[in-house]
Amino acid sequence: MCIRDSNGSYRLGPGSWKLGSIYNSNFKIGTEIRDILNQICEVTGQSAGYWVRAGKKKVCLYRVNSKSELNHYVVEGTTFELNSATGKVLLAYTDKNLELKKEIEKKGYIYTAGERLDNIASVAIPAFDNKNLFKATVSVSGWKQFFTNKTVPKYYKTLSSFSNQLRSLLSNE
């Protein structure tokens, strides 16, 4: 896993890459999820992501970044604190945060702006399998000037329009 350099310092070796590749290959649905994210990205013009909780952080498992020059660019595998819309959905369903869960159940989504980065906003929804077990959160994110009173409900509608496809995929993993 680790390699010692000639100067005596250590760094991650190829074993880490192999382990990560094995982990990722266990998610055979990744291609299908990316296809859905790509469709969401095309409809909204914003970046789309699929996030899961990893301890006290959130990790972006799958991502399609917007093709716009002004986009919110994140690389798959990146971890962040549990804030913004994605973090709040994860907290609502993994920490049993009833206040957040009630908000999501009432509106269907969480919207935040400027929580992690000043100019970035996001809309996130929970993703469930056919047994209604929480699996992840799916979101759109981008520059907050593109998230208005008119566009936020449209982004939610787009996300929710793909929830049945996700539900079916997540039930087969």
Positions of PLM-derived features:
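Short loop/turn microsegments at loop-to-beta-strand junctions
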Residues: 7, 48, 122-124
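Juxtadomain coupling helices with adjacent low-complexity linkers
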Residues: 97-102, 107-110, 118-119, 136-173
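Amphipathic alpha-helical effector-binding/dimerization core
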Residues: 11-96
